[in-house]
Amino acid sequence: MSEASGNLNSLRMANVALREELNALRGENANLGLQLGRALAEVNSLRGNVSSYIRWPVPIVPVLAEENLEFALSEIEVIPGGELPFLCRPPPRAEPDCISDDLLINVIQDRSTPDGPADPPLLPIPPPPALPPPASKEPPPQPPLAPLERPEIEPFSGDPVYLAEFLMQLETFIADHEVHFPGGAERVAFLISFFTGEAKDWAISVTQEGSPLHANFPRFLDEIRKEFCGPIPPRVAKKAIRKLKQGHCTLGSYADAFQFLAQFLSWDDCRLQNQFLKGLSEFFRKELLWSTEMADLDELILECVEIERKVRVPKPIPLPGVRNIIFPFAPSPNEEESEDEEYYSEDEDQEARRHRLHSKDQRKRMRAFQQEMKEKEEEEMKKEEEMKKKEEKEEEEEEEMKQKEEEEEIRNKNEEEGESKDEEDEDEDGGQKPEGEPQQDPGTEETYGEVEEEPLDEAQDDDLDELMEMEPTFVHASSQTSGPTSGYHAENFLGASPPIIQPSRRRNQNRVPLLEGLPGTNSPFYSSPQLIRRTGRLGQRQVRRRPPVLFRLTPRQGGHRAARGRIRV
């Protein structure tokens, strides 16, 4: 019994061991199946590579150099037909037949077994990759540029009033088309093509071959401003600087034109800044709202240059298909193209269709609202421009009125001064009346309205020329009696002729005051000169002229003044 139970236990143990071996074999079988699948996949890939390399490549023959040979290459006989020599021919190779699948599987199994060969099967060598052709030293030909349209700019003939606006327009055009003007010579030639007359002759003579201005565009602009610098009348410069607007021109050209015209004006810095801001474009004016107050015009121009530099920095390009976050209903280009095309699917339920139509209506409303806002902004801009134009016209009218008032005030002051001088003359006459008024010659009589009235100074000079023909009267101050020889004593002449009075002297210089305290001043022979009356402004004008009267003092009366000769009073 004990032997039977021992055998049974041993059989059971053997059965368990066999089952374990069976399970191990099943696992190995599964692993082999996986390896077989991978091997078949590699076989398929290798089959594709083999089929692509069926045509064997021609072997590379080494290049023979003449210095490495004992004889010249020219002594070699030329082989007809372009065939290679026998030594240079590649060994004959048979065309490979199609490899069977069983052979490939056996090769892979031998490779996977540890006793099999370790070397992989020989495969055809792929040809070396074709080297790219060497890059040529010459630059690639550039596509031809489109012909440049000539701008509609009035030619410059040399008038300095139009120089600022002319240069501003041309500098902006050249800056916008820099591709067509790569060098300074092209820019100088293009600028000269808009000159006419004397300006063109001067520019051609200055920019000849070998001249430093031939290819130096900035220096040529400076020479133009020096040559045609003016002068410009202040009134003309004021009108030109008010008409100067930046528009689409660059800031640098606008600033140069403004400073060129400002040098002919006597405005203060605050007024220049206000006028500079009026001519700026709307973009710069909006940006300057956030900046502080500028000290002078130069600081304002530098601030505008800094704003322009920030704007010219390239901005990142938005990714396509990304919806605007700020305005989620803003139109996208893809939606605008397919706006009219609507597709309805049968599977789309009613709620989804309703949501899609609602979003589409919202987009349309947003577009209409944005369009209305743009139209309102344009209308406001037009109104602001009209208001600015009206204000400028009113300012010009006010300035003209002020100038007229100032001129009228100056005229009134001159008239009042003339009247006051006439009254002073009458007072200085001491109330003495002339013995008789001379009759006016009909030839010299002038009527108001028939002949144009001469200026006051010219009329006075003419009257003085007429009076120069009258003989001067000499008085002896030491005698109080009148006589035919009282004015002709030797001590009064001293062998000298009377002085000649220039006609350009004013009447105030020839005025004779009352000689009080001197003997003989109230004598019967002394009388006031005659009055000369003429027609003038407002029908009558009274002009008083006196002949020059010279007095001589004796040494007893004159003292130290008698040594000087005649004393003119």
Curated annotation (Swiss-Prot):
Compositional bias segments (type: Acidic residues): 334-350, 416-429, 443-469
Pfam name, any one: DUF4939
Highest taxon of source: Eukaryota
Basic residues biased stretches: 353-367
Biased amino acid composition, Basic and acidic residues: 372-392, 401-415
Biased composition (Pro residues): 117-146
Region (Disordered): 115-151, 323-506
Coiled coil stretches, renumbered: none
Comp. bias regions, Polar residues: 476-485
Note: RTL5 is one of at least 11 genes called Mar or Mart related to long terminal repeat retrotransposons. They do not correspond to functional retrotransposons, but rather to neofunctionalized retrotransposons genes.
Record-given protein name: Retrotransposon Gag-like protein 5
Organism for this UniProt entry: Homo sapiens
